[in-house]
């Protein structure tokens, strides 16, 4: 070969998500069987010494392999070449010409050697159904006939929190109920392929069950069309060590601005990384579902919106001399994981407290109404 491999020919995604800085795929914390038992965290030890031991052991293994290969017969050597040729998942970079000299850097060469050959998703789905390709054709037909641009999307936020072989998979995304171009089983196949867990039926079944449970739970709630209702949304979203917090007014019946468009505008205005776009949209969808649930249960008063607007208007200018409207401005803070969890716990406590207070007010109003009705009834009977 006279040039490097073509672009996007190799993928190293399965190795990148195993990095400690990526919270998608993390190692589960060891549990203690006894309260006095000590949990050993091997990451606290000197990894350089362990790495030197592994390198020395690998060198010894390579020397033994060279001596054993020299003693092989012709038949064994041919069988070994056939086995290497059948391994299509690993790139062949040993015999590749490098005119630019980029592969002389150890980190770049290591990245190439640890990567896999990228496979089209159609081939992954065909391999999952035994190579017949029927599932792919059905999905394409359903997607062409069942989903169009005129159909209103019903989006449900999905969260995954699974454990598999000592690792935790924590992820979030959105699922459109009116888009039938991809089934849950096909999505699980592609998801496991990206994580380098191909043909793992147990993990695929866990993913399908987790998504299906959340779809059944929020399907009716997400399909409800509410009237012209203005609400206050206190949105918090954390990604890595950054915490985004905002307080704004949202009309649940206004379809001119979607959560995805709102997230894109926020990312552009605040100069955040594009990874915040799906995170903000997902958090906004979750907040909208919670508000819809409160509205259906009668815990939301549509006549009074605490937006702080001047002259009692639904929206507009806010007259705030003390803080100059700082409570209605977006904030981005760099916090530790413990501080972010503390903020989330405080937010949940405040939401539960406000819900209890609103329930008490509704109960008092109901009692007063009942008492007035009894007084009116007694007055009528006397007359």
Curated annotation (Swiss-Prot):
It comes from Eremothecium gossypii (strain ATCC 10895 / CBS 109.51 / FGSC 9923 / NRRL Y-1056) (Yeast). Its main location: nucleus. It comes from the Eukaryota. Keywords: Cell cycle, Chromatin regulator, Nucleus, Transcription, Transcription regulation. The keyword Nucleus applies. Pfam families: SNF5 (PF04855). Residues 61-80 are annotated as: Disordered. GO terms for cellular component: nuclear chromosome; nucleus; RSC-type complex. This is Chromatin structure-remodeling complex subunit SFH1. PANTHER family: SNF5.
């Amino acid at each position: 070969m006279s040039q490097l491999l073509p672009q996007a020919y190799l993928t190293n995604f399965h190795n990148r998500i195993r990095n400690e800085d990526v919270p998608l795929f993390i190692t589960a914390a060891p549990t203690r069987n006894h309260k006095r038992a000590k949990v050993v965290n091997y990451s606290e030890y000197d990894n350089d010494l362990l790495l030197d031991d592994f390198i020395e052991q690998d060198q010894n293994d390579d020397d033994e392999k060279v001596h054993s290969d020299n003693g092989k017969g012709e038949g064994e050597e041919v069988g070994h070449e056939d086995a290497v040729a059948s391994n299509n998942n690993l790139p062949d970079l040993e015999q590749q010409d490098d005119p630019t000299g980029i592969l002389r850097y150890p980190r770049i060469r290591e990245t190439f050697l640890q990567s896999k050959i990228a496979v089209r998703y159609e081939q992954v789905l065909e391999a999952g159904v035994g190579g017949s390709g029927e599932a792919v054709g059905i999905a394409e037909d359903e997607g062409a006939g069942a989903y169009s641009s005129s159909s209103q999307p019903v989006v449900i936020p999905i969260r995954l929190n699974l454990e598999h072989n000592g690792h935790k998979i924590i992820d979030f995304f959105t699922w459109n109920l009116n888009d039938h171009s991809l089934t849950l089983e096909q999505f699980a196949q592609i998801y496991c392929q990206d994580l380098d867990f191909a043909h793992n039926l147990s993990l695929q079944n866990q993913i399908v069950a987790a998504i299906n449970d959340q779809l059944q739970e929020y399907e009716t709630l997400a399909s409800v069309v509410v009237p012209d209702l203005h609400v206050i949304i206190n949105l918090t979203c954390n990604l890595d060590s950054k915490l985004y917090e905002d307080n704004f007014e949202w009309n649940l019946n206004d379809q001119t601005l979607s959560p995805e468009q709102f997230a894109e505008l926020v990312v552009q205005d605040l100069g955040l990384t594009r990874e915040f776009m799906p995170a903000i949209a997902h958090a906004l969808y979750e907040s909208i579902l919670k508000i819809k649930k409160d509205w259906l249960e009668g815990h939301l008063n549509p006549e009074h919106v605490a937006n702080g607007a001047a002259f009692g208007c639904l929206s507009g200018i806010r007259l705030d001399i003390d803080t100059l409207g700082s409570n209605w401005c977006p904030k981005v803070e760099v916090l530790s994981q413990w501080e972010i969890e503390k903020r989330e716990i405080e937010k949940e406590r405040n939401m539960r407290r406000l819900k209890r207070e609103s329930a008490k007010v509704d109960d008092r109003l109901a009692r007063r109404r009942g008492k007035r009705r009894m007084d009116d009834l007694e007055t009528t009977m006397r007359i």
